[in-house]
């Protein structure tokens, strides 16, 4: 996956809120810059010092927790499946995480570019996405995320 230029807004934060169930402080996608429902999405997460996790992780050297980077990638994956026709309504949740690697710290002031691609969708209930997060073109996190539909 290659980084697109984050200039065009395909989905605003308000439109994202209409597609995902997450809300502050757990809404981790600021805008979508490339989107093909059922196939792929590229989104932006701006990392700011006023986010609540930095009060404790770590006050003297704030670092974005890796689990929140993975959650941001999962939310972008959720956008991919959010508009697939004939998909049952319900909540998609994590079912597994494979091969996730963290390559460098993410700090306030960084802009995560998150790219996700749907790898599989079985019985319209179980799926897998490939996800990558970069900052200024450098890979910071990658892996495969599995999800399942909860009725």
Swiss-Prot record:
The active site is at 57. This is 3-hydroxyacyl-[acyl-carrier-protein] dehydratase FabZ. It holds the Pfam family FabA. GO terms for cellular component: cytoplasm; membrane. It comes from the Bacteria. CDD domains: FabZ. GO terms for molecular function: (3R)-hydroxyacyl-[acyl-carrier-protein] dehydratase activity. InterPro entries: FabA_FabZ, FabZ, HotDog_dom_sf.
């Amino acid at each position: 996956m290659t980084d697109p230029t984050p200039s065009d807004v395909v989905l605003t934060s308000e439109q994202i809120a209409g597609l995902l169930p997450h809300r502050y402080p757990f809404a981790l996608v600021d805008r979508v810059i490339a989107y093909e429902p059922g196939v792929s999405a590229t989104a932006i997460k701006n990392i700011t010092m006023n986010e609540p996790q930095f009060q404790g992780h770590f006050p003297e050297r704030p670092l974005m927790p890796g689990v929140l980077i993975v959650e941001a990638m999962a939310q972008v994956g959720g956008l991919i499946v959010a508009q697939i026709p004939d998909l049952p309504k319900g909540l998609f949740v994590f079912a597994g995480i494979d091969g996730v690697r963290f390559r460098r710290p993410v700090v306030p002031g960084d802009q995560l570019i998150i790219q996700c691609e749907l790898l599989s969708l079985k019985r319209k209930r179980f799926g897998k996405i490939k996800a990558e997060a970069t900052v200024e073109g450098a890979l910071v996190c990658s892996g495969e995320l599995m999800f399942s539909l909860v009725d």
